[in-house]
Amino acid sequence: EAIAANGMKVPGANKAALEAVTTGEVGALVAGVDYNAYSSKAKGEPIDIYYPAGGTVVNPRPAMILKTATNMDNAKAFVDYLFSDEAQELVAKAYLLPGRSDVKCDSRSNLEDILQIKPDWEKMMAEASEDSAKVNELCSANNG
């Protein structure tokens, strides 16, 4: 509520939200994806990336294979490639968090350096509708 009272704006998806900061339209971005910010900073944008002192949620990007995949061998080979040295280095160079703990990022915070919140998933699901309605109400007030 305090952020909304301070003129919170919801400019759009990740790229649009970050551009609002880099163009000076707004002074901060809350809850953006960090890899876009690291990329922009590497390109010379005058921004910094901060994680909340109390922790944040890290959203993993899993790879899955359908039980009904028509070419199971190729699907497994692709997932194996995703975790290969080559692919994990590409992930790190794209400012994403590698899926393997032995691959480190030189140009961003590594997973072990980011304090993570341990969500209470049951509580979150039980309160999801009410929380979503409140966030939508706050966002609508400033972006209406």
Model-derived features: positions:
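A bilobed periplasmic-binding-protein/Venus flytrap-type ligand-binding module shared by bacterial periplasmic
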Residues: 59-71, 90-91
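Extracellular/periplasmic catalytic domains that process cell-envelope and extracellular macromolecules
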Residues: 22, 41-43, 56-58, 69-73
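Periplasmic-binding protein-like
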Residues: 82-105
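Substrate/cofactor-recognition hotspot
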Residues: 78
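Stable alpha-helical elements in mature extracytoplasmic
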Residues: 17, 36, 71-75, 87, ...
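Extracellular/periplasmic bilobal clamshell ligand-binding domains
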Residues: 107-144
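Solvent-exposed loop/turn segments at secondary-structure junctions
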Residues: 34-38, 54-57, 70, 84-85
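Ligand-binding pocket segment of bilobal, Venus flytrap-like solute-binding proteins
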Residues: 1-52
